[in-house]
Every structure is written in C-alpha cells, then in structure tokens.
C-alpha cells in the first residue's frame, strides 16, 4: 500500500486478527499444559474429591504461577487491539453500501449497541483476568456472568446486523464470514448451557469425570468465542488500519478513521 502525505502508520488488518485470536488461544493452551505438568494434583482437585483429569479454566489460569502471569500478560496485550476492532467493525457495518434505505436511526442505534456490548465484553474479560476466584469469588462470578451475557447478546446481534446491513452479500467472502459467525455463536451458546448443566450436576451428585467434561466444555466455549471474533479476517480481508493526521498539521486521530485496500 502506498502512503499518503498525511498517513502516519498503516497496519494490515490480518495482524489484528492474529493478535486477537493468537494471544488468548496461546494463553489458554500454555496455561492448561503448564498446570497439568506443574500442578496436576492441585489444579485437578475438586471439593468432593472425585476423579478429575483436567483443570477448569479458573484453576489453570488464575491460581498458580507462572500460569496466572502468562494469562494476564497475554490477555492484557490482546485487549487493546480488541477495542480498536470493536469500533472498526461498528463503522464497517454502518458504512455498508447495501444497508437498508429506511430505518437509519434504528440501524445506527443497534450498531452502537453491538459496539457497546463488545467493549463491555472486553471490560468483563479484563476484570476476570485481573480478579481471580481465589481473591474475590463473588466479584469473579459476577464478572463471568457479565462476560457470558455480553458475549451471547453481541454474537447474536452482530451476526444479525451483518446480514441486515448487506455485508453478507457485499463481497464473496461475506457469506463465508456469516456462516462462520453463526457456527461460532451456536457453539458458544451450546457450551454455555451445557457447561452450566455439568457444573450443577458435579456439585449436586459429585460423579467421577463430570468436572473433566465441564473443563472440556469451558475450553470449547473460549475457543468458539475466539473463533467468532476471528471471522473479522474475512470482513476486512486485504485491508489496512491507517493512522492519519486530521488536517495535515500535526493533529492525529487515535482511532482508525480510514480503512484502505492493499494496492
């Protein structure tokens, strides 16, 4: 891509997707492996002492060192790009050439709501990362509930908006992105309710192996959430986020105001 006179920085959008997908998935994988290798007995223990072979996400990422530091660093690093992408996706939807000709105020409100939910999801994720269940179980549980609710509503709303604004049919990759969004959202919602059931069943009946299944469902929920957000690769395929001066006189926009295609 050629730089204009007022362009300060240009970053291919695919690197943002690598960051928002690669950092949290790597953090989860590393922390689970380390907890199994270094703290197997502690990380897999349960309150009723039944057989369990996998740590829950909370046990794997927020209880022992060095796992909790790896998790906090990698999640913290990926939050910044997530915030930028949340606003960029909102502008992407509103800028669709195939958006409806009527109901502009309603559409803008829903796009703003989706963006707000996405930002709030990241806030709750950051709070979950900073406050472990062992430090403040009540607050940690509330943050998890907020994260899950915001995630589900955002996934469903943004997928609907992607179709409603015409982005699904605007490019050849739009249909693929839409299908992957539906897949990621469906798996996340399924994992949420299945995880709640397994958690209840474990605490009620204390059956061997149930908490292991719960942990697997937790991992699947996290990975499906990451997968959903990585569909942005298709939405912004071949594009760059450009930092540019407002008037060519040294006043700079801190958020992406121009998304150009590679030339």
Curated annotation (Swiss-Prot):
Superkingdom, taxonomy of origin: Eukaryota
Organism of origin: Caenorhabditis elegans
One Pfam entry name: Frag1
Similarity comment text for this entry: Belongs to the PGAP2 family.
Gene symbol of the encoding locus: pgap-2
GO annotation terms (biological process): GPI anchor biosynthetic process
Annotated signal sequence range: none
InterPro entries referenced in this protein's UniProt entry, alphabetically: Frag1/DRAM/Sfk1 (IPR019402), PGAP2 (IPR039545)
Membrane topology term: Multi-pass membrane protein
Ranges that cross the membrane: 16-36, 69-89, 109-129, 143-163, 180-200, 208-228
Principal location class: Golgi
UniProt protein name: Post-GPI attachment to proteins factor 2
């Amino acid at each position: 891509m050629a730089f204009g006179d007022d362009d300060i920085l240009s970053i291919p959008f695919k690197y943002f997707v690598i960051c928002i997908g690669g950092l949290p998935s790597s953090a989860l994988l590393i922390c689970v492996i380390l907890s199994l290798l270094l703290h197997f007995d502690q990380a897999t223990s349960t309150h009723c002492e039944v057989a369990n072979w996998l740590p829950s996400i909370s046990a794997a990422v927020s209880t022992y060192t060095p796992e909790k530091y790896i998790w906090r660093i990698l999640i913290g690093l990926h939050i910044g790009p997530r915030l930028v992408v949340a606003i960029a996706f909102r502008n992407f939807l509103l800028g669709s050439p195939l958006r409806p000709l009527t109901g502009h105020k309603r559409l803008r409100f829903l796009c703003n709501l989706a963006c707000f939910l996405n930002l709030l999801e990241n806030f709750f994720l950051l709070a979950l990362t900073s406050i472990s269940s062992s430090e403040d179980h009540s607050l940690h549980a509330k943050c998890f509930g907020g994260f899950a609710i915001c995630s589900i509503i955002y996934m469903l709303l943004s997928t609907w908006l992607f179709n409603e604004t015409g982005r699904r049919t605007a490019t050849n990759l739009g249909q693929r992105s839409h299908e992957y969004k539906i897949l990621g959202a469906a798996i996340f919602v399924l994992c949420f309710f299945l995880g709640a059931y397994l958690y209840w069943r474990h605490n009620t009946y204390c059956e061997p192996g149930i908490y292991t299944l719960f942990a697997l469902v937790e991992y699947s929920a996290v990975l499906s959430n990451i997968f959903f957000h990585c569909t942005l690769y298709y939405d912004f395929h071949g594009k760059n986020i450009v930092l540019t001066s407002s008037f060519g006189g040294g006043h700079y926009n801190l958020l992406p105001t121009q998304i150009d295609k590679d030339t």
